[in-house]
């Protein structure tokens, strides 16, 4: 098996070059420009965090990714799915409220935010995979 390339940047920031700018450079170095995004919807899957915790990426990083997608002609949007467990992300309305309270808004990330599985987390489709098998249907 071929070894994967690993890209690294440190957290030190120089005047005029913060972490979001470094993230943009990393994306380009990793080959994001090889992906045809011209006039296509581009989902940026992200965890919006639970209320009261800090285990999610900050809005400025999401904006950096969305900006690169736009530069490549894509139409980015941030997305996540509702949770199966009770909490602040169990339905789309509360999920979006949670995202907003954690600083993730269309204004701060530079693109729309959509909950992928609908209002109650029940909007889904089955996609058959050639050569795949179902464990339980």
Spans of features found by a protein language model:
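N-terminal and secondary-structure boundary signal
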Residues: 1-137
